[in-house]
Swiss-Prot record:
Needed cofactors: [4Fe-4S] cluster
Pathway: Protein modification; protein lipoylation via endogenous pathway; protein N(6)-(lipoyl)lysine from octanoyl-[acyl-carrier-protein]: step 2/2
Binding positions for [4Fe-4S] cluster 2 per the UniProt entry: C107, C111, C114
CC terms in the record's Gene Ontology section: cytoplasm
Classification via PANTHER family: LIPOYL SYNTHASE, LIPOYL SYNTHASE, MITOCHONDRIAL
Organism: Xanthomonas axonopodis pv. citri (strain 306)
Residue ranges constituting the Radical SAM core domain according to the UniProt record: 93-312
Record carries keyword Disulfide bond: no
SMART domains reported in the protein's UniProt record: Elp3
Cofactor note (record): Binds 2 [4Fe-4S] clusters per subunit. One cluster is coordinated with 3 cysteines and an exchangeable S-adenosyl-L-methionine.
Family in the record: Belongs to the radical SAM superfamily. Lipoyl synthase family.
Domain of life: Bacteria
Coiled coil: none
Designated name of the protein: Lipoyl synthase
Length: 337
């Protein structure tokens, strides 16, 4: 089942300024080509790789998925499962679980791997924390994951809105465990402000994804910084030693085993407790191409490597995502639901 690295794929990185993208309008989503055309990089001449047998998504029957979608729309809530085109959406929705995305559906970043829309976001919805808390209570969730788009337009990066959501959930569902998956709060003074605000009502698990190895950041995460993300994770852990920290990395963007192992060592050196490792899947032809499909044996090797480094929980597999079975991941790390 081994698969060689596709070293011959002719990946070319070119300026994203060759085509005039649609103008930004507040609250209007730019997706696919419109989004990536605004990116500092575009990818051309990379052939589409055939998905191997181990990349399979189970689509369950029944009305659970549609019922949950109706409940979300009724409460004007958004899930990252839908906005980011997660391959596990049918499985999670059929079990009544979802990762809620706050602060709107429009991101200020243009990461080449992500299917969330880019644009000029609207101001935060002041009613969202109450709506989210009501939905969590109505669904009877014992564990909830709350994430957001990047909000570089906000002075605190959206930290206060996270706290408002955490507080609202704790009020209506005091026994529910809360994991937040945050942006990097990058910008002058923004990390300081965000950490100060998050300390007012911290979550049970703090998650921020490193996403890829440092050498690939310019192409994969333009606008982000590898060391900044590591520092955010370490500083939160230093302020809250008893709260589990978590991060995630995608494979298949052109990284090597040695680079992935080095990134895992960096995460442990910055006091990250939990790690998720999964296969990158290209959401549209405009996005970063899949350079290689890593094998199940390689994921198992990385799981063993992560355990040897001392992570409290390692979730490593082709279909693993940051919030996929997050409750089980947290339980494996000692966070009781």
């Amino acid at each position: 089942m081994t698969q060689p690295i596709a070293r011959s794929i002719p990946l070319q990185v070119v300026s994203g300024d060759t085509a005039a993208p649609a103008p930004l309008q507040t609250g209007v989503k730019q997706i696919g080509g419109d989004k990536i055309n605004r990116s500092p990089v575009q990818f051309v001449d990379a052939p589409v790789l055939r998905k191997p047998s181990w990349i399979r998504v189970r689509i369950p029957s029944g009305n659970a998925v549609q019922n949950l979608k109706a409940k979300l729309r009724e409460n004007r809530l958004v899930t990252v499962c839908e906005e980011a085109s997660c391959p596990n959406i049918h499985e999670c929705f059929s079990h009544g679980t979802a990762t809620f995305m706050i602060l709107g559906e429009v991101c200020t970043r243009r990461c080449s791997f992500c299917d969330v829309a880019h644009g000029r976001p609207k101001p935060p919805d002041a009613s969202e924390p109450a709506s989210l808390a009501a939905t969590v209570a109505d669904m009877g969730l014992k564990y909830v994951v709350v994430t957001s788009v990047d909000r570089d337009d906000l002075r605190d990066g959206g930290a206060q809105h996270f706290v408002d959501c955490i507080s609202a959930i704790r009020t209506s569902s005091p026994n529910t465990r809360i994991e937040i998956l945050t942006p990097d709060f990058r910008g002058k003074g923004r990390m300081d402000r965000a950490l100060e605000i998050l300390a007012l009502s911290p979550p049970d698990v703090f998650n921020h994804n490193i996403e890829t190895v440092p050498d690939l950041y310019p192409n994969v995460r333009p606008g982000a910084d590898y060391q900044w993300s590591l520092t955010l994770l370490q500083r939160f852990k230093a302020q809250h030693p008893s709260i589990a920290t978590k991060s995630g990395i995608m494979l298949g963007l052109g990284e090597t085993m040695e680079q992935v192992q080095a990134t895992l060592r960096d995460l442990r050196a910055h006091d990250v407790d939990m790690i998720t490792i999964g296969q990158y899947l290209q959401p549209t032809p405009h996005h970063h191409p899949v350079m290689r499909y890593w094998t199940p044996e390689e994921y198992k090797a990385l799981e063993d490597y992560g355990n040897a480094l001392g992570f409290s929980h390692v979730a490593s597999g082709p279909m693993v995502r940051s919030s996929y079975h997050a409750d089980r991941q947290a339980a494996g790390a000692g966070v009781a639901a």
